[in-house]
Amino acid sequence: MKGLFLRIIAIVALLLWAIDMVFPWQQIMRSEENRYTAIQSRGKLVVGTINNPISYFIDHAGQAAGLEYELSKAFADYLNVDLEILAMSNGDELFSALKNNKIDIAAANLLYQPNKLDMFQVGPTYNSASWQLVYRKGTERPRSLGELKGSLSIASGSELTELLKVEKEKYPDLIWRVNEKLTPEELLIQMADGKIDYVIANSIDVSAVQQIKPNVAVAFDVTDESTVHWYLPSNSYSELQASLLDFMNSAIETGLIARIEEKYFNHLAQFDYVDTRSYLRAIETVLPKFAPLFEKYKGDLDWCLLAAIAYQESHWNPDATSPTGVRGMMMLTKATAERMRIQDRTDPEQSIKAGSEYLHWLITQMPDTIKEDERIWFALAAYNMGLGHLLDARRLTKSLGGDPDNWLDVKKNLPLLAEKRYYTGLKYGYARGYEAYHYVENIRRYMNSIVHYYRVQQAQIEETLDTQAAEIENINEIKKETDTLATTVTTQ
């Protein structure tokens, strides 16, 4: 009887232990599933990010843009809910918002960080990057952390602090400052402007800033390449995480991620210091003269794109002439000028108007099967090498097993139009397809530089105005206190 009683006690204890173990797990699962349910109930996905040229920014037209924005928008559409973006200044703010349930996902080209795994879940990887130490071109290049001769700054919220603590054992004189106010982009710009000596930043952020600050130079990689992820709230496997996994798999299979990456940073690998520096100088000194014309004749295009085309064609020189006879700002052939009914190809207004109209016409010639946001790249290739050769490139792509409606597939085959084994079987024959390839890539790079140049300029203007307003308010407060003191003295 006593043995039976002990067995009953043991069974009850085991059941209580099982309940104690399972119940919290169920609570965790229910909590995280409630987050997914809450997203559906509120009809809105809230994503936190950091404002920069790659992840998220508001362009000159007031529209949201960026890789993380477009990917987040696609995920929100997948969930059939609206999207709300909350822009943070740094990683600390971002992860704090995630921890405190102010956002559902943190998405800002965030590298895999083992020190975050106790607090957060990571989504599937969709990119890779490394930490790089950067310095200002024209100053002495350090070869290691032990050769730094000045101030080193990092943005808050990353694994860098822990990494640098380890490095300090090797380099005892290593000192750094964690900046809790500035974004990585702002830190890089300050370094380029001589306010900071060194910065460690994500290689993606570095490549983006180099398009507007070409004196940002990479000294060395601090780490090897690591995977990039979205971060989700803590807890176990959840319905939200499962949905994200399904979405990412679909985005990879359909080419969505490849198209978004192509749009925002695949062309950044072509960075050229001399060309970028000359281009930015032209943006400052030449573009303001012609910007109103690009705006006037943009039609359905972004005026920055039209300006980028003109720079690629003539470096904004209205009198430009090539050995083949093309002339003017948009480097029009005589036949195209006659077709567009313009009299003087060297007149900048006539040239820009005709170039825009011709490009709009080329866009209408693209098959409806090509996605709306990719039609412009096909049209630009046709603008450069002719519509017939572009059609040949699409046919060749199809014959090689690619998708003729996918710009990524077609552009990699453009150089083949100059190879005899391929062009002999094409309707329009030989073409310098490699030139068309670089033509489109350059225009995309030039356009991004214009967009972000004006974005940074506007941010600096707003910062200056805020500073001036604060100074005026401070002066008024001092004056008010002085007047009060004077009144008190007079009364006495």
Swiss-Prot record:
The keyword Signal applies. SMART domains: PBPb. It comes from the Bacteria. GO terms for biological process: cell wall macromolecule catabolic process; cell wall organization; peptidoglycan catabolic process. Residues 270-492 are annotated as: LT domain. Residues 1-18 form the signal peptide. It is an enzyme of class 4 (lyase). It is a peripheral membrane protein. One of its GO terms (cellular component) is cell outer membrane. It is found in: Cell outer membrane. Pfam families: SBP_bac_3 (PF00497), SLT (PF01464). SUPFAM superfamilies: Lysozyme-like, Periplasmic binding protein-like II. Its EC number is 4.2.2.n1. Keywords: Cell outer membrane, Cell wall biogenesis/degradation, Lyase, Membrane, Signal. HAMAP family: MltF (MF_02016). NCBIfam families: PRK10859.1. The N-terminal domain does not have lytic activity and probably modulates enzymatic activity. The C-terminal domain is the catalytic active domain. In the N-terminal section; belongs to the bacterial solute-binding protein 3 family. Murein-degrading enzyme that degrades murein glycan strands and insoluble, high-molecular weight murein sacculi, with the concomitant formation of a 1,6-anhydromuramoyl product. Lytic transglycosylases (LTs) play an integral role in the metabolism of the peptidoglycan (PG) sacculus. Their lytic action creates space within the PG sacculus to allow for its expansion as well as for the insertion of various structures such as secretion systems and flagella. This is Membrane-bound lytic murein transglycosylase F. The lineage of its organism: Bacteria, Pseudomonadati, Pseudomonadota, Gammaproteobacteria, Pasteurellales. The gene is mltF.
